[in-house]
Amino acid sequence: AIQFEQKAKAFNKDDWKNFLIYVEQERGEIHPVTYELVGEARKMAGKVGYEVNCVIVGGKGTKENAEKLLPYGVDHVYVYEDPGFEGFRADCYADAVADCIAANKPSSVLIGATALGRSLAPRLSTRFHTGLTADCTTLDIKPNTDMIQVRPAFGGNIMAQIGITKSRPQFA
């Protein structure tokens, strides 16, 4: 049998603050899932005093789309606009979002459960050696900033509550 043991590195939760939402663009427009994630993050942010920030990656027109998010209660939008980001390429987008995460150290990163999000999220959680809960149906947050992530399990017969307590950022 092959054994693999990995111990979590010590970290300080106080170093990791706020929410970061990946903003997906589709045909030059912000994907509707982004607004759903902003709403959920706003609810949780109010409980722990966090900001709701976004990161958007794309080609021409990305900065203009970023400005559309501000009326929805987003505190900051980090924009990665470059002709090289025309069309989704998972590794290039993961590099940009990972740069934003490393620079800002969000406690939680929310990514929509779209085809693009399902490609991007595992790449990012692997880079940061932390957990990812896919297909969440409910999100909440504890006073200690651990997210409670609820998702269907065993063919939808039960709802599993999942928490990432020993690493940051938390991906959902």
For every predicted segment, state its role.
Residues A1-A172:
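N-terminal glycine-rich FAD/FM-binding segment characteristic of electron-transfer flavoproteins
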